[in-house]
Structures are given as structure tokens and as C-alpha cells.
């Protein structure tokens, strides 16, 4: 996420909220795949799409996780019960396996503030890059974000 950078407004929001965690969310576009804040087990928490129940329709959620968090460091000095997730991917036309924890699961354990951020323009907080081609196609947006000429990116 090239949009995530230190921002006094985000830090101020996090401190003012007195939450242990702040999770940044972005408006969801039709092609987006990712987690969203949902009420589960009596608490609003980030549920990644790989954890959605089989009959859940993700199109009903209008925001999703940017995978950008701010934490109060003292609240991370614990052992948290986090799930292990097995994900199959194709890398250079070969099947690869990724076994991972999801950082968003910390929202099940920590008081969390939810913050919807801009998704376009100079002040965007969310500019995801999944492939090298994404980087090339986002040249102008990156230049706008960082006040640089597009040919200098």
C-alpha cells in the first residue's frame, strides 16, 4: 500500500480515540477482494474474506481493509490467539503455498477504532500494488501523492 505513510492526522485520531488499534478502511470498489469490519461474537472486528461464512455475500459491505493499522505498542506485548491460514497462489505459473497469520485478527482482541480514508487524489491513504505492472500504471497517482513529476517516479 503506497498510500500508507506517517500522517499527524491519523496519529492524532488514534491517540484521541484511546483505542489500542486503529484500522484504516477504504471505500470498496467492485473488483476489491479483502476483509471488512463485521460484528462477530459480539464485537466489531476485521474479518478477512477467507474467513467469511460460505453463505455470506461480501457485496453488502461498502468498505474494506487497507491492511494499514496503527497500534499502541504497550498493547502488543501479549500472546494473541491468531489463526493459521493456508492460501494457494500461482507464482510464475507455479502453484505456491502461503501459510499466514492475519494481522487484522488483532481487532478481535484489542479495542479498535475504525477510520475510513481517502482512496484517490493527492491525499489518498490507499494505493495498493499487487504486481510490477500496477506500479507502472499508477505512475501519475504516485507522482500526485508525493508532489513529484510523473517522469521522476
What are these regions (language model features)?
Residues 2-152:
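Catalytic core of tubulin tyrosine ligase-like
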Amino acid at each position: 500500500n503506497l498510500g500508507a505513510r506517517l500522517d499527524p492526522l491519523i496519529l492524532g485520531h488514534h491517540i484521541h480515540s484511546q483505542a489500542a488499534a486503529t484500522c484504516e478502511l477504504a471505500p470498496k470498489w467492485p473488483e476489491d477482494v479483502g476483509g471488512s469490519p463485521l460484528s462477530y461474537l459480539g464485537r466489531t472486528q476485521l474479518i478477512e474474506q477467507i474467513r467469511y461464512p460460505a453463505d455470506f455475500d461480501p457485496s453488502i459491505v461498502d468498505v474494506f481493509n487497507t491492511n494499514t493499522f496503527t497500534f499502541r505498542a504497550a498493547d502488543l506485548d501479549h500472546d494473541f490467539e491468531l489463526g493459521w491460514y493456508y492460501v494457494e497462489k500461482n507464482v510464475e505459473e507455479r502453484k505456491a503455498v502461503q501459510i499466514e497469520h492475519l494481522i487484522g485478527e488483532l481487532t478481535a482482541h484489542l479495542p479498535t477504532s475504525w477510520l475510513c480514508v481517502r482512496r484517490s487524489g493527492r491525499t489518498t491513504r490507499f494505493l495498493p500494488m499487487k504486481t510490477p505492472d500496477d506500479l507502472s500504471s499508477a505512475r501519475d497517482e504516485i507522482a500526485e501523492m508525493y508532489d513529484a513529476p510523473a517522469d521522476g517516479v
